[in-house]
Amino acid sequence: AKCAHVSNYFATEPQIRLASRLIALAGAPEGSHVYFGNSGAEGNEAALKLAKLYGRTLPGASPSIGGKPARILALTHGFHGRTMGALSATWKPVIRKPFEPLVPNIEFVRAGDPIAMYEAFSATGLGQYGKGPVAAVILELIQGEAGVRPLDVAYVKKVRELCDINHALLIIDEVQTGIGRTGSWFAFQREDLTGGITPDIVTFAKGVAGGFPMGGMISFGGKLSALFTPGSHGSTFAGNPLGAAAALATLDTIENEHLVENAEERGEQLRQGIMASGNPLFTSVRGRGLLNAILLSHRCSHAAMNWALEHGLIVNAVAPDALRLAPPLIVSEQEIDEAVSILAKIPADLPND
C-alpha cells in the first residue's frame, strides 16, 4: 500500500483486490460482496445488522400490520464477540450478564440438537403466543471458546435445511476457523463438517492479515446486496489500504508456502501423536487442522496449562477439562514432535483447578 489510509468514501485498489480474492477463496457465487471491518466482532456485527435488515423483508415481520419482529437464532456455548450485537449472540453468561439488557430478538437454541432447532423455527406464528419469523441462524462449525467442539455434520445439514424451508439466512462465523486454520481455506468447505452445504454469510478475521487488524464478512450471491444502502453500515478504517495490503500478502504467503495443506498434515500428526503418547491424563482429542483440544481425565486444565508453559509450550485452558492447541500455520513436523513430547510428560495426577 502507498497510503496507510484514505477516506472510506473511496474504494482502493488493494481493497478491491482483497474482496475479489476472498470471494474466490470462499467459492462464493457471482453477485457476492465483502464488507470489511477491523476485527471478528465487527464482522459479526455487520452480519447481524444485515440479518436484521433481511428479517424486515420476511412475511409476518411488520409490526405496523400486526406482525412481530424477526428473530435471530444463536447456539448455546457459541462465541461471536464482545461488542453489543455480537455479545447478544454469545452464550457465556459470565460475559453477558454485566451488560444486560442486550439486543432483543436473539434467542439461544441448544447446540447440536436438531429437534430444538426445529422447535425454535416452529414457534413462528401470529396470535398471542406466536413469534416473529427467523431471519437467520448464526453458528460456529467448531465452537472454539466452548472447548473446540465440532458440530455434527448431520446437524449442520439439518440447520441448512430448516433455513431453506423457512427462508432464513445461515451465518457461519469463521473468525477462528477460517483462513486455513482447519486445513481448508474455510471450515465450511470441509465435507466432514458441513456435508457440502453453502452458507449465506461467512465472517472472518484473526489470521486474514497476519496479525494486522482486519475482519469482515462475505455475503453469498446477490439477494442481500441491496439491503445495505449508503450510510447504513461503515467504519472509518475498515478495509484501509494498509490492512488490505497486509491481508493480500498474508494470503499470498499461505498459498505459496502451502500452509493450508500444512495445517491439515500437521494437525493429523498432532492428534495422532497425542493419542499415542500414553499419557493417562488425556482421554481424547478433537478438532480439525490446527485447531484442536485435548480432553482431560479431570478438571485440571489450568494446572496443565501452567505446567506446559513452564516447560516451553503455550496451550490454552479453554475449558475446565480441555486444553486448546492452535499452533501457527507454519509449524513444522519437528516442532509438532517437540510439542507432543512436552504434552506427554504433563503429570497425570495434577490437582483439580
Region spans (language model):
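Conserved N-terminal phosphate-binding loop of PLP-dependent enzymes in the Aspartate aminotransferase
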Residues: 1-353
